[in-house]
Regions:
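Two-component/phosphorelay signaling modules centered on CheY-like receiver
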Residues: 11-29
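Acidic, metal-coordinating helix/loop segments flanking the phosphotransfer/catalytic sites
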Residues: 30-48
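Acidic catalytic/metal-coordinating carboxylates
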Residues: 33-36, 59-63
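Conserved phosphotransfer cores of two-component systems
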Residues: 42-44, 66-74, 83-85
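Active-site residues of response regulator receiver
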Residues: 52
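Output/docking surface of receiver
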Residues: 90-113, 117
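Receiver (REC) domain active-site loop signature in two-component systems and cognate sites
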Residues: 55
Length: 125
């Protein structure tokens, strides 16, 4: 079963998002800040990291960089309520929170090789 780490400082959003991902057949684990996410990343393997753009302490770009230092193959998807952002080279995609599902599910399927991207979906960061 493919594993997804979902990081958001809004615990309710993180838990609900994990429930939706689990209903789609993924193993989903939540973390509520970057430090907790890195600890969980050290404890187990994840196929994808989904992280909030703004969090207390470590932000999304710092978290993506640290995750890629450990495993550069893990796609990082940023979710934000602040409009389009550029996450840099460590970010595979950026999605708006208000349109999170089903867009997140589509990106996950693409990054896990479960679906071919349409030409306009190749990179949206």
């Amino acid at each position: 079963m493919r594993a997804i780490l979902f990081v958001d400082d809004h615990e309710v959003l993180a838990r609900l998002s994990c429930e939706i991902l689990e209903m789609q057949g993924y193993r989903a684990v939540s973390a509520y800040n970057g430090t907790e996410a890195l600890k969980k990343f050290d404890e187990e393997d994840f196929d994808i990291l989904v992280t909030d753009f703004r969090m207390d302490g470590m932000n999304d770009v710092e978290l993506a960089k640290k995750v890629h230092e450990k495993n550069p193959e893990v796609p990082v998807i940023i979710v934000t309520g602040y409009g389009p952002i550029d996450g840099g080279k460590d970010v595979a995609a950026c999605l708006q929170k208000e349109d999170l599902f089903p867009a997140l599910l589509e990106k996950i399927k693409i990054f896990l090789g479960e679906r071919e991207p349409r030409p306009q979906e190749v990179k949206t960061a």
